[in-house]
């Protein structure tokens, strides 16, 4: 157990508490002197703020007992989480699949609250449901005299009930949403719980949002203020004044939100709510209501090529059985839907179309339902029947036809250009036109969001769009472009009645339609089958490629390669489970189907990326922190961010924040200034769940942040586990969530040693430097100072000159520089003046294989990117961090060159597709272990990313992000490619009695990795070579100044600094004014030299800031991380030295 103390973190009194107590779920010793089991804490505590949490647990237990008594089963974890929210007074939307018991929960909660004399209001969409629900709730032990149901009533009864409603003479009121709309004036304003069972129906009348808010205690003025803030937030091109106004109004609304008297719980929407009024819930109640989409798929994706669509369709429908959706490609037109229906029915297959009543299909009386494979089609968009739908067959590849005429819709032209872009890029002659195409795409994308009415009302805008259409049309009909399309493997050009039309795959249509076969239910995700009847090979190839932009896990297989019998058996097994759950045959305690889990990561970017992998998340705000909620398999995930470290060593207690006693070293941590809201919000959020997964970065810093968060949350959550992932991809996250682990205490100890060493040495040295120079901002870190010394020494060498006679050869893009060095300037000048030619003797000529460089580690990436692009090392680390968080590269703080099987798969796919299978040459490079090289996570090159940005699928990437990504991508792909076979020559160069040997690479015999990562060739020199016009006499430095990149390279070579600290060291030297950067080179300042000389002259200080001390300490920290060294012994040795040094009062 690691010993540590956290200031102000006792969950009961807010005082000091040990990490040991926190991790055991206990308050501090002052609050509870004896150590008891977590379960006994509430019984033993007499007073304090933790009693509120105890009361929550007690209320939850009472509700669970009540639930079990009325229903005969225990509630599921998700229902318990909803109950916690109600008891905590938090309004929320229920994101949950079919069969999880949303209605049951609402009724049980209303019934439970009624026993306490608290009022509930249940709002339903139809009169029929009002009657069904009222009958059901009577079986929940509700006193019927305290229940008001607004159903089919006589006028007398209506009058009587309205009077009772007005007086508040009831515990539970059940009505339709229309009743609320017409009668809200008579409704009391003291409801404890309002349950909206069908939010889609509720929202048909947008004013219902206002009315339910009145019931919760808000005024008309409050709602007006909230709506004004919504309008302000949605205003385009906001000014600084607008942002100030948003801040001011948000603070005012936070106060208004405290008026809320009850809890509103609504079921999540199944359609996209159209009214902006729905956003009032976000501003006043802290939660969003949107259409949740689940992007998880459990679908076997197959295809077959066919010349006869109808016959093949009939064969497959008969083979697959009932529960099928048939999607006709939109290029066949709506009439084809009827044709297909008639054809199937003429061969004994009962079918219905999307325009007919689907009840026959749901009952199993119709074998298939037929629609169009477009995301706009109701069958592709709206059907959610997990117990019925088993498979989807695509009658032709889903396609979009783009007529090449002026009237073509803006969105279709956009698709056409996006599909054409990669083809233009591969053509050397057309490459120069990509910029123009990109500009068109950006403009078309902007216009695609505008409605026809909006455009019609603005003649200038209409003209601009018409002119753009004409430009694009002329381009698409150009002879060379038409030829390019005709020869393409992915696009089809057809000559129809109205001229040429371009045919591209409808990717969103495919994903939306096939997704109907795999739906969330209370047991997870149903298995489905999607089968494409390929009528156009090019369109299918286009579909295969584009579908990977959305989901890397989709792989089409030929139908012959699939065990169809087994797939259909698994599909039927799932449908049976769904039916049993819907019919109530499966009891909840048989299996915990959907489990709520809190996931904490470091950054909001990472939280968003992860949440978006699994669907469109719903947002909430708790205690000032943002939470995203989404379904991941059988987990209901609430994901939030800690924004990095939350705690740091205190500054003014004990020995620089550490209790040092008898060989024991106990750090004291405090909340970092500005992070108080995060601590409060995380603890409030923790009270809603039983499990938290900590997904901080996979290194020592991430492990320590995670361990701190574990200590913070443990009093409220019994299960705190660590999840580790080295790339932010759907597959990696899912694997991590399914395989949590304990915290690795060795990693935590290593970070603890690093932080304490930095604090002890840094504080002591900085104090002395600040006093000596009377500048309070100066510092002297244990890594900073030796690195400053190198820069100073390098500058001294830079000022010393040597003389070089340089000969430069340029030949067909090839370069070679030969240099003859001299210490004496006169001798150099004499050599230069007499040099007319050189003699090149070929000593050996051979063929050899040149291997590619390994993939990047942190130091090699920083060196190459910094030197190539002149981007600072801290900025590069920020760019890499963001690329990692967006899910585009693996973790960027690494010393490893190892390539995983997943990485090799990424390379294989891209190299085989783009360059040819013969160039793929897999290599693992480094040793085994958790860490991997820096590589792309998907087989997408930089132009794919640009296309995705233009299509709106990737946001927030800058030119610099793309430069770094391209470098990482090419270096990695090169590392997985064939060596290059080259011709080399070993030559001896003689000139005026001087000679030197060189190895020249003169010819590429067989292509390999050079296809992506250029290989330098030198001119083929031999015999006597005239150099009179190629020579130059120069004075050059003995050594060149460091660049940021070469400084990182030096740190790595000398064993100082680590992947997580390189950038910090460089930025500290610049921030403190010890070093400046000029033309990309690092130059020590006068202050930097003075500080270094001052420290160097103090023999008692220098050992602590020497290269040797720092390197040894880094090695010891590595050993602590590996469990080979006791961290307390390392701290003990360090303490003795620092303490001695302090006492000496240097």
Curated annotation (Swiss-Prot):
Which terms does the UniProt entry file under GO BP? DNA topological change
Q: Whom does it interact with, and what assembly results?
A: Monomer.
For this entry, the protein name equals Reverse gyrase 1
Q: Where does ATP bind?
A: 79, 96-103
Which reaction is the catalytic activity of this chain?
ATP + H2O = ADP + phosphate + H(+)
What does the record's cofactor remark say about binding?
Binds 1 zinc ion per subunit.
Q: What else is known?
A: This enzyme is the only unique feature of hyperthermophilic bacteria/archaea known and seems to be essential for adaptation to life at high temperatures. It may play a role in stabilization of DNA at high temperatures.
Q: Which GO terms describe its molecular function?
A: ATP binding; ATP hydrolysis activity; DNA binding; DNA topoisomerase type II (double strand cut, ATP-hydrolyzing) activity; reverse gyrase activity; zinc ion binding
UniProt cross-references to NCBIfam families, sorted A to Z: rgy (TIGR01054)
> Can you tell me which residues bind Mg(2+)?
602, 697
Indicate the segments forming the Toprim domain, all copies.
Answer: 596-728
Q: Which cysteines are joined by disulfide bonds?
A: none
What's the source species for this entry?
Answer: Aquifex aeolicus (strain VF5)
Annotated RG N-terminal-type zinc fingers sit at 1-38
